[in-house]
């Protein structure tokens, strides 16, 4: 990690995070802060990983397989330029452009091209944010709100099937200490695609824990990484956190979700009993390198159990 103030201008800050290894990642941020006037930012981020993903994320015509999961090499390089200002002295309001390179391939499939996505995407986006949490990872008080709408306007279209579409999403959370050392946290979020045909690789994909979110890949207790997918979703997360002694936490979480394609078309497909649920019990410690956590989770639907370790800040 490297951070430098006044790199080019007297009111700017630049930061670079890099991880080398099997899954190379970096995150570069540059921001010129003009206070209540319009500020300028640039972000460049590379994410790579190799995982088994649910075949629901993919087009069966691409894979020609009935397998439930496929091993995939994931490459995402995103570059954003944006403007941001302060609205009503509380909310961050802004928008910008993003150029993304997305490549997915699998060597495990037979009789088909191993590269099933290799496209560039240009999108415009707008956002509104607010955050008053006293801490990022183990908040005791405050609330936050994030919303974004993004329109994909252009693609180099590797598979010759691109049509313009948009994705809207929002999340809200609140934390409150109910008595000494016990904090309850409530979080809800949702999103949906707008358009005749969206790209399945930008669907909402749930599962796993302890990673920085990329595109619309999101955590969900009780299910393995990249297990649930759809172009729309709604999710609820409830957490009880007890600080057993300073900077050491025990917590219990329950999350519920409905995920599918166009679930908001009718109220009967989303405002109903959740199709997916999961629970977790864990221990976390606040350190100078970020949170160190162990979580054990399970789901009553699948009867599967997963244990995750997370060390340091997520990026």
PLM feature segments, named:
Residues 1-125, 208-218, 226-234, 291-315:
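Gram-negative/organellar outer-membrane beta-barrel architecture
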Residues 6-8, 34-36, 85-89, 132-134, ...:
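Outer-membrane beta-barrel strand-turn architecture
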Residues 16-20, 42-50, 56-60, 95-101, ...:
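Transmembrane beta-barrel strands of outer-membrane/channel proteins
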Residues 25-27, 51-55, 102-108, 135-137, ...:
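Outer-membrane beta-barrel proteins
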Residues 114-115, 120, 201-213, 259, ...:
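Solvent-exposed, glycine/polar-rich loop segments of beta-barrel outer-membrane systems
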Residues 121-129, 133-245, 252:
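C-terminal outer-membrane beta-barrel translocator/porin domains of Gram-negative envelope proteins
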Residues 234, 246-250, 275-279, 288-292, ...:
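A short pocket-lining beta-strand/turn micro-motif at the edge of beta-sheets
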Residues 239-275:
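C-terminal hydrophobic structural anchor segments
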